[in-house]
Amino acid sequence: MARYNPFSFTPGPVVFFTTVIYVGLFAALLVTHLTVPDYPSDPPAGINLTEAWADLEHITRRFHPYNSHANDHVREYLLSRIQGIVATKHLDGSQVEIIDDLTSNATFSSGATSVYFEGTNIIVAIRGSEDDEPFNSTDRRPNNGGVLVNAHYDSVSSGYGATDDGVGVVTVLQLLSYFTESHNWPKRTIILLLNNGEEDFLNGAKAFMRNPISRVPHTFVNLEGAGAGGRATLFRSTDTEVTRFYSKSKYPFGTVVSGDGFKKGLIRSETDYRVFHSDLGLRGLDIAFMEPRARYHTVEDSTRETSMNSLWHMLSAALASTSGLAAVTGEEFSGSESLDNGRVNAGRGSDGVWFDLFGRVFVVFQLHTLFALCVTLLVVAPITLIGLTFGLSKADKNYLLARKAFVYSSDDDNPVQLYGWRGFFRFPIIFISATAVVVALAYLLVRFNAFIIYSSPFAVWSMMLSAWFFVAWFFSRGADAMRPSALQRMYALIWLFIGSFVLLTIVTVFVNNYQVVAGYPALFYFAVVFVAIMLSYLELFFAPTKSAYARHFEHDANSRRNSDSASRPLTGSTTAARSDDRPVADDDATEITSLLRGDRRGFTRYGSRRDSASEGGEDQAQGSQRLDLGNVYPGEQEWSGKLPSWIWIIQLLLLAPLVIVLVGQVALLLTSALYQTPSDGNSPLFIYLAIAALSVLLLAPTGPFIHRFTYHVPTFLFLVCLGTVIYNLVAFPFSRDHRLKVYFVQRVNCETGANTVSLTGLDSYVQRIVGELPSAQDQPLNCTTPDVATRKELKTCEWEGLPAKVVPNAAGAAPFGNETNTGRWLEYSIHKGNRSNKATMLVVGLNTRACRIVFDSPISGLAVTGAVSDPRFKPVGAAGSREVRLWHREFGQPWNVGLTWDAEEHAKLSGRVVCLWSDANTGSIPAFDEVQHYLPVWAIPSKISDGLVEGFKRFEI
């Protein structure tokens, strides 16, 4: 009785090991992605997590956007906390300096928008032990630079800002406490920045650039939030050298794919990272929360939805990164020359590739290393396989694509059939069929339930994965049952090699030409496929030579010439030899041969030259050899019996784990980043196609082994596929835990008192939502495409809403309705000089510190009284400005704005003066309160722009 081999290439081991590897690694990836490591019971000296959580609860009690009174209260609290921390450490001004910056302002432009902003930043400078220069010196600074740690303390008008950016703010407070401990004192100067105004246009970071201390740091750590809890990921990094310091974190998390997503605009939101790197010239990191996006900028961005574990995850990452950067005393982050464009010369880093492994290990290497490895593999791998093919041919063991072998000579009219072609085209046909099914499912979802991904991303993933696997198994198993082939595994690997070669070539081009490195998994994918196929080539050296096999066949044919079993095929349904059943030469089946064709034989073969020679040539028969062909898998070619039966498991261990980990990590990150972006106007089709493509990449390594699977696992997956298809097609796409985000704004004509409330959201759903609001009932809805460029896929529905009460009476400070007093909400006056293309406009809004001037035609010049010129900033862009945004640090203060325009093209300058109100804490915006109260449980409001209420008046010069 043959001994059972638990590692042989038979159904039992294949099903067991493949299932264990895939299920185990999928589970490990999901646990890493969906859970957060526990915070320590004994944190490092200087860190107090209980205190940090109390700070977070305090600053997130109310909405606190820049344009709100609650924002001032948060600022006062943070100043008092900073002063308290410094006081308890008994530090003087030479060691730690607190800068209450109420003087810096910035005037700049972006596209057709100009901004004048007055900052209210809080800056704390901890002098490094090896830095002696004064903090604010403009000509003497630390040669090796300092480290900037930034978070913004303003929230949006529709959210409490727990993770955006409350956790970042309390992290900065804890870093202040930590680094002012004597045993933790940094070698390099650390600048802690709590900036105000990030949510509105990255204004706070721009104002920081106007402070002389902004020239001290050369590196930075930016702390942000675009979700509500979970792990803080490394969103992006400027270079490899800086990223290595993040790798010291105990729980690193992230991949360079997110950085490329920012570069290519897949992630639309921006952070202060852009200002610090692109405008100021610093090198650093962007650490941020990223999901769930449905809670981003809503009331669910609160302490209830996050945790102390999440707080510790960001804090520990910031602590490790800052500690490492602050310990560098060399010239790594200093350029050799000073720059005359106002930027800091922080040296030049190298583009990098980085990713974590299960949230514990962080891999970092340079882009040029990736490129070199890609090119090397693309050259070495084909040459190696060509060499192995040549070696097999020299050894007479190249059964690949071999159709027949000759006993005597090539003109033998009845050669031995080898069936080397069998199975060659099988894998691409199966691969294309299975891939077509998952792509079709993507289009099916878009057609019938496009937004199910919003609440059920893992149902979509389960559908795609189970569909691809079942279809691939069905065709593979069917083909194997009809025409078994010992080369099916090897041919599948050859096709995987070809496909991954093409993929790596594309990735290499993008790496070299565009510095896009998100395709880094392709390098490892191709590498493991190359090693696996190389093992299959080496495996063939264990096969008998084709000539010896043919002689064995001839000897057996002579000995059993008169057997009655002359019609059996030349494959091993048992381990016994079947060499007497030689098919004729034209019986070599391929993938395009009919499956119903039998082994046709005629009497002519018995009159062939070989028969005559065998009957009369005793010498030849005596010279022939009988081979031990080993254990042939039932139905497969007899020459394969001596091939090692355990090579497959090495190939599986090469292919599956690395592909699952690297591709699976990218898949989870992209899912988290994109699955709730349709509410922002993103196309769901792109998301479904991305999931389909990643499903194929994840399961393609099963292709060489899938034909050995029994029906049990595929049947289970078929039922999973069937259930998830039905669910994904009929389930409602939103829920209490995954609310559809809709965008609110109220516009008031301050001249007529007319007000319009609008909600912007997904077509058909936003109409249902508005229909449930009492103020909108029995009113005709006007639903149009929004004028916001990034939300063209959405619909805006307008109706006459509840009057806003954003300006209190001067005497009793009681609110009043807009039907009588809106004319006083904002005032403007225009003074036109002697020149026809110049004018000065005085603008003031009551109970606000944010107004705008929107022009019907562009202006060419802008000068705001109190603004300071900065060569780094241009007040007006090259194509002019159509909008000027004005921000004051005090409520109700006027702006004096000088305007210049092209009088030849536009004799008159016209437009609107708009003032904004963003404070939803006091009940002064009843329409917003109504939306929050009456919205269905599956929807949630957010702000669409800087203000919740916009009051306007027309003007003409």
From Swiss-Prot:
The chain crosses the membrane at residues 11-31, 370-390, 424-444, 451-471, 491-511, 522-542, 643-663, 686-706, 714-734. Glycans are attached at N48, N105, N136, N782, N818, N834. The active site is at E198 (proton acceptor). SUPFAM superfamilies: Zn-dependent exopeptidases. It is a multi-pass membrane protein. GO terms for cellular component: vacuolar membrane. Zn(2+) 1 binds at H152, D164, E224. Residues 1-10, 391-423, 472-490, 543-642, 707-713 are cytoplasmic. Zn(2+) 2 binds at D164, E199, H297. Residues 559-586, 603-627 are annotated as: Disordered. InterPro entries: Fxna-like_M28_dom, M28_fam, Peptidase_M28, PFF1_C, PFF1_TM. Residues 32-369, 445-450, 512-521, 664-685, 735-957 are vacuolar. Residues 603-613 have a biased composition (Basic and acidic residues). The record marks Y296 as: Transition state stabilizer. Gene3D superfamilies: Zn peptidases. May be involved in vacuolar sorting and osmoregulation. Belongs to the peptidase M28 family. PANTHER family: METALLOPEPTIDASE M28 FAMILY MEMBER (PTHR12147), VACUOLAR MEMBRANE PROTEASE (PTHR12147:SF58). This is Vacuolar membrane protease. The lineage of its organism: Eukaryota, Fungi, Dikarya, Ascomycota, Pezizomycotina.
